[in-house]
Amino acid sequence: MEAWDVVVIGATVAGMRAAIAAHDEGASVVILSAHGLGNSGSDNYSSGLAASIDESNSMSHRDDTIRGGDWLNDQDIVSNRTTLINSHIAQLDQWGLNFRRSLSGSPGSEMGLGHKSPRVLTTGYSTSREIQHILEEQCIRREILRRGDWLALSLGSFRGQITGVVALDMIEGTVECLQSKAVIIADDGFENAWHSGNSSSRGLSISLDAGCQLRDLEFISWNPLCIPDTELSLTVDILQNGAKITTISGTQIETTPDMTPNKLAFEINKAGGTALLDATSIHKSAIEWYSGLRRAVKERTGLDMFEQSIPICPRIEQTIGGLPVDEHGRVVKGNWNTWFTGLYSAGGASCSGLNGTGIIAGNRLMEDLVGGSCAGMHAGKWIKNKNFSGTQSLNEALFSANAEISDMISNANTNNTSSISSIKSKLWNSITSNMGFERSSEGLQNAAKILEN
């Protein structure tokens, strides 16, 4: 049986930032990803990275975040995240991230949906992917082991304390047991319940099975700029660089400083659910930074977005709810004074209270970086005086996982096996129709009935 100080589930931005922080505290760390390495879904971020680097303090960023979340945020967490992000910007710059820059040479701040001051930093259209690559380089430099195509099956625990992870090595076809002092859940939320995508919610699933509770599941964040009938999603930052949105009839949809991505998505939905993105007048200084997006759109649709308008529609970007965590990323249990000992969470799988009802531009990456770093740092320090334990509980979890897989295989035959695509289609249709822009008690009950069947 392998033994690691910290096991990170999810090779996401948050997961790798957590692994780096834990490693720098002296912990032995392994990252498990259900996807292939380098394929963590970092392309579905709707904006760059928010930070108040050109302001004297982070008070305005804090206020905009609270306003964008309809005042349902955890205000202490908001202050914590908006204050700490500036040091992460300096670190990313030092590690080689190629920000768009101002005339002074420092990372340039742009306006963003939900912000009343310029504070969104980008590398063009692919900020999240570039940060993903930078963090991968830092993991390689530190010799942090990353394992792709490893599916977490269950958490091992004994008397309310984490003892390790049971996972399926999908390449070798074996079920393995990894003993650990701490586990960091850092994969994704459950946004793939609405549509196909590259996200994985295994962390939430196994945490629920282990007895954890989830928080704020009713709140979701929309990306208003997605291309219908494709998996392409565009960055809303292009709206600050000369692009405009019009309805099918030609009426322009104005974007104001008070408009968040969610509010813009609702406006498009009110206008019929589909609109047009006009990027033909994009600023000359931005053309090079968005040339990759232009190429991707043309390859998928045959349309040149710099020469003709392209159709767009809103789509779920991320679920806001998840595992309730404190400022250190510890998963709380029952009340804020008790935590599931040894279990941490960061990124899309967590719910710190930062966002309230919706995410303003750039705050998703901010939460991934700061939340991941806080979770990894605390875990790296916490495990120093802890011993490995719970070998028996892990062996029992391993036995149960093997038995469940064997039972599934033995009961599978052509007569009772449903089509995976058919099940997914029914799920997407039910969730989209009953838990989209409009919800009702009757619709939620109908969705629950369909899921039960």
Residue ranges of predicted features:
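An anion/pyrophosphate-binding glycine-rich loop and adjacent beta-alpha core
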Residues: 206, 212-316, 378, 384
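Conserved N-terminal glycine-rich FAD pyrophosphate-binding loop of Rossmann-like flavoproteins
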Residues: 35-64, 70, 221, 225, ...
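N-terminal Rossmann-like FAD-binding beta1-loop-alpha1 element of flavoenzymes
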Residues: 6-31
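Rossmann-like flavin
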Residues: 68-108
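A glycine-rich dinucleotide-binding beta-alpha-beta segment and adjacent secondary-structure elements
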Residues: 148-149, 153-168, 292-350
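Conserved redox-cofactor binding core of oxidoreductases
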Residues: 94-174, 179-182, 186, 226-230, ...
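Glycine-rich loop(s) and the adjacent beta-strand/alpha-helix scaffold that form part
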Residues: 182-232, 361-378
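Glycine- and aromatic-enriched mobile tails/lids
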Residues: 1-4, 21, 25-27, 37-38, ...
